[in-house]
Amino acid sequence: MRKLLMLLFVVLFASVVHVHAQAKSDADLIRQAALDYIEGWYEADGARMERALHPDLAKRIVRVDPRGRYMLGQMSAMGLVQLTREEGGKNIPKEKQQKDVTVLDIFGNAATAKIIAADWIDYLHLAKWKGRWVIVNVLWENKPAPQQAPRSSSN
């Protein structure tokens, strides 16, 4: 009986370790998709950007015009890939190319991640599509402009 319990414990422990390793593997793959997206942008590498995206991707930002009207700015996967190929973030100095990726949640074939970039923050929804993690939605927002210190007046 004791041997049976020990065997059961070993099998149960091994399955828990396997599940944890799989989740870590998914987290690594999600992080890689996010890095393909942001590093592809900074490097103007359209192929890398395209690899990170689902073809039906929607990238959106909430904008407010000067009259206070709200608008939803949108970009498709192909529009983003084309813009990446044309210029991307090549004009952003290397030292400003922030790319902090955090995987926020994974459940089945769905995941959420956050990228803190040079002047903006991206919230990504990813899906495990045909065995690969790809970005299907991006909601982004510009970081606030840095506050400048008030100038002192000289007399």
What are the residue ranges of the model-derived segments?
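Positively charged n-region of N-terminal signal peptides that target proteins for export
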Residues: M1-L4
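Bacterial N-terminal signal peptides
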Residues: M6-V16
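Residue-level detector of flexible, active-site-proximal loop/helix-junction positions
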Residues: V11, V64, N142
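Short, low-complexity N-terminal intrinsically disordered segments enriched in polar/charged residues
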Residues: H18-A47, R51, P55, A149-S154
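Surface-exposed, charged secondary-structure patches
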Residues: Q22, V62-R63, M71-W120
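N-terminal, post-signal-peptide region of Sec/Tat-exported proteins
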Residues: Y42-Q82
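A mature extracytoplasmic/lumenal domain signature
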Residues: L53-P55, R63, A117-D119, K128-K130, ...
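Short beta-strand edge/turn micro-motifs at domain boundaries
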Residues: T112, D122-Q147
